[in-house]
Amino acid sequence: MDQTHLEWSYEGAHDVNPKKSDVVIFTDGSYPDDGKKETKELNPPMIGAVMLSRLHLQPVQGMKIVPQELIDQWLPRKNQICMVELLAPIAALWTWRHYLREKFVLLLIDSEVVEAALIKGYSAREDVCELVGVFWDLALDLRVQIYIDRVPTDGNPADGPSRGRLFHADQGWVTEDLCWPKVMKRELGSQRI
C-alpha cells in the first residue's frame, strides 16, 4: 500500500460530527442448501444488490447468477452461501463504481458472518480472506469511506433480487446487471477469474 492511500484512508478519521451517507447499498446472496443438482438448476446461486443514492433519483437494483466455474474455485464446503453473500458487496462496488468514487457509503448486509469478515478484514478461511481483500482493495481504489452494518433479512430489499425477483420499472426502479472485476486475485492455484 503506498503512502497516498494511507494518508487518504486516515483523512477525516477523527471527525466526530455525524456524516450523512451519500449512498446506501443493501446486498444479499442465495444458495440452494439441499445439495441437489435439480435445485441448483431451478434456483441457481445468485447475488442481489440495491443502491439508494442522493445523486440518482430512482432506486437501483441488480442481480447476477453466480457461475459454477467460480464456485468450483472456492474451498470445498457443504454450503457456499457465505462466499456467495461475500461476492455481492464486491459486485455492488464494481457495478456502481461510477456513483461511489470518493463517497461515504453505508453498506447493509444480512449475513453476520460476511459483516464480521468485512469489518475485521480477514477470516480463518483462505478463500474468504481473498474476497475480503478484493473488497477492500476496490474500496481503496475508489476512495470510498464505508460503514458496514447488519440489516435483518426481512428488512433487506436486496433479498428479492438475490432470488431473481426484481422490482418493476413502473414502481420507479432502475435495473442494472451486476458484475464483478474481471481480474480478482486467486492465490489458490494462481488462477485468475
Regions found by a protein language model. Give the residues of each.
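C-terminal, well-structured subdomains that either form a transmembrane helix-short loop-helix hairpin
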Residues: 25-28, 78-79, 83-96, 107-109, ...
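A short, polar/acidic, helix/strand-boundary loop motif
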Residues: 51-87, 113, 122
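C-terminal functional segments of enzyme domains
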Residues: 141-193
